[in-house]
């Protein structure tokens, strides 16, 4: 069994994308490959088949490997809930919240969890394809590292280093990163991949020749810039949109300081009839057909931010003029009358008044709800699939008019008596074509085109595997994977 690791010179260098591409490239050949990320820091997460929580990038990589997501694919997930702290999730379950200093001391425990997961995957699959985090050359983070070279040294695996040429300085990034590694770590780097190149490759060739001569390591290939690649972002909100038709529905989403699972909105970005706008701090709230309150890792703090930025008055005005309002997970909790956090799970213990638009209250509890679900989205009763990731338990009379009837017999969320407001705990509901179309009709779009988001994602994964075939040295890659030339 072989482990191969992809590390990057910076965040957003293309690590997730390359691991996704390599997983599908190997799966096409019938190789049993599994994705793995030792430690991930992200607020976008997915629910696994075994009832845990991992980064969404690893869920996409699992799809590329033709596997169901599993907690061993991302044994340590850090979900920031303040500027200096994060909720620590190990093997899919929340352990506690820690500040950076406390987590540094906890890393020995985290490393053991990482190695346990890697050992299980190595026993079950031919190739473990590993994604690093950020950069391996962050001097202040190297002590006790479990995400990059610390992991590679622990399991004795080779490394590919990827860099993004589109941002400039690619040769400085690669040479500088290599120079900051120890001799044993430098020896692990088997070669380089340059990502997001546009232009004439012949003009780049002298630089590639210099890089190989300077470092003694091969350039494994140059991946082109793909203008319309729309895989789910791991951290930053992707604001690119597909081309729009003449008739569009205007949808507005506030960029909360602790917004979570903003990948919920990717299907809307790609929908030809939706004009999606993310609104940040200090920006005026534009007129819209639909306002969506997204998920949040710190609901009470983000609700205070909404009020401070004028959103409460803007929402009231929006509703007075007939606009629709949707709350998802933390956004649902904000719609109620009260949010209580007696245990201090998301910040200082206490409670906050909600927006008071639906008659229910929420109490945050230590036992987080994690499940994949399916059911019927009301009032049209169209099929919907999604997933729940929340610590809140909501109760109140508004829940007697649910938004979703789940197949397991439970009901979820609420719809206001006048039909203007809908709230649900379900993430991912826009990925269901029928549910997405029903929500767009509810928001005022008459003739809705159905878009199969899963088919679009599968198409992009296939395109990435094609790039491996045409632009990378596949003979060397096969050798790194222990498969021969």
From Swiss-Prot:
Pathway in which the depicted protein is active: Cofactor biosynthesis; adenosylcobalamin biosynthesis
Gene Ontology terms describing biological process: cobalamin biosynthetic process
Keyword field: Cobalamin biosynthesis, Glutamine amidotransferase
Ranges for domain GATase cobBQ-type: 248-435
Keyword Oxidoreductase set for record: no
InterPro entries the UniProt entry points to: Class_I_gatase-like, CobQ/CobB/MinD/ParA_Nub-bd_dom, CobQ_GATase1, CobQ_N, CobQ_synth, GATase_3, P-loop_NTPase
Keyword Glycosyltransferase belongs to the record: no
Catalytic residues (positions): 329, 427
Gene3D superfamilies: 3.40.50.880, P-loop containing nucleotide triphosphate hydrolases
Pfam family, one: CbiA
Molecular function terms from GO: ABC-type vitamin B12 transporter activity; catalytic activity
Family of the protein in this entry: Belongs to the CobB/CobQ family. CobQ subfamily.
Matches recorded under HAMAP family: CobQ
Protein purpose: Catalyzes amidations at positions B, D, E, and G on adenosylcobyrinic A,C-diamide. NH(2) groups are provided by glutamine, and one molecule of ATP is hydrogenolyzed for each amidation.
Record-given protein name: Cobyric acid synthase
């Amino acid at each position: 069994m072989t482990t191969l690791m992809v590390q990057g010179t910076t965040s957003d260098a293309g690590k997730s994308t390359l691991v996704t591409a390599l997983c599908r490239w190997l799966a096409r050949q019938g190789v049993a490959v599994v994705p793995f990320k030792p430690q991930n820091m992200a607020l976008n997460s997915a629910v696994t088949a075994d009832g845990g929580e991992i980064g969404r990038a690893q869920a996409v990589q699992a799809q590329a490997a033709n596997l169901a997501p599993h907690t061993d694919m991302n044994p340590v997930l850090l979900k920031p809930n303040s500027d200096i702290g994060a909720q620590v999730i190990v093997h899919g379950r929340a352990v506690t919240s820690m500040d950076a200093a406390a987590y540094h001391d906890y890393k020995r425990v985290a490393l053991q969890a990482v190695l346990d997961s890697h050992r299980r995957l190595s026993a079950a699959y031919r190739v473990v394809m590993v994604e690093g985090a950020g950069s391996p050359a962050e001097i202040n983070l190297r002590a006790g590292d479990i995400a990059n070279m610390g992991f590679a040294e622990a399991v004795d695996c080779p490394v590919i280093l990827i860099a993004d040429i589109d941002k400039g300085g690619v040769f400085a990034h690669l040479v500088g990163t290599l120079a900051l590694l120890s001799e044993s770590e430098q020896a692990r780097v088997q070669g380089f991949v340059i990502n997001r190149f546009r232009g004439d490759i012949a003009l780049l060739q002298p630089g590639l020749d210099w890089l190989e001569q300077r470092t003694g390591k091969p350039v494994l290939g140059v991946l082109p810039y793909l203008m319309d690649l729309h895989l789910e972002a791991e951290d930053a909100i992707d604001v690119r949109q597909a081309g729009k038709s003449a008739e569009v529905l205007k949808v507005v989403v506030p960029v909360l300081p602790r917004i979570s699972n903003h990948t919920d909105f990717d299907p809307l970005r790609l929908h030809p009839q939706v004009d999606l706008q993310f609104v940040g701090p200090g920006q005026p709230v534009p007129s819209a057909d639909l306002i969506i309150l997204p998920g949040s890792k710190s609901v009470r703090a983000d609700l205070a931010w909404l009020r401070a930025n004028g959103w409460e008055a803007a929402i009231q005005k929006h509703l007075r003029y007939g606009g629709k309002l949707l709350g998802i997970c933390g956004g649902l909790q904000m719609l109620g009358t009260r949010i209580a956090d007696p245990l201090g799970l998301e910040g200082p213990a206490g409670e906050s008044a909600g927006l008071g638009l639906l008659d229910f209250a929420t109490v945050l509890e230590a036992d987080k709800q994690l499940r994949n679900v399916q059911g019927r989205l009301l009032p049209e009763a169209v099929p919907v699939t999604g997933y729940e990731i929340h610590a809140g338990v909501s109760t109140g009379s508004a829940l007697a008019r649910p938004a979703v009837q789940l197949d397991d017999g439970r009901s979820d969320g609420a719809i206001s008596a006048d039909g203007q407001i809908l709230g649900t705990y379900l993430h991912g509901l826009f990925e269901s074509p029928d549910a997405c179309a029903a929500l767009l009709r509810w928001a005022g779009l008459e003739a809705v085109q159905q878009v199969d988001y899963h088919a679009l994602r599968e198409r992009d994964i296939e395109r990435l595997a094609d790039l491996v075939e045409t632009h990378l040295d596949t003979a060397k890659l096969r050798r790194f994977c222990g498969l021969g030339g």
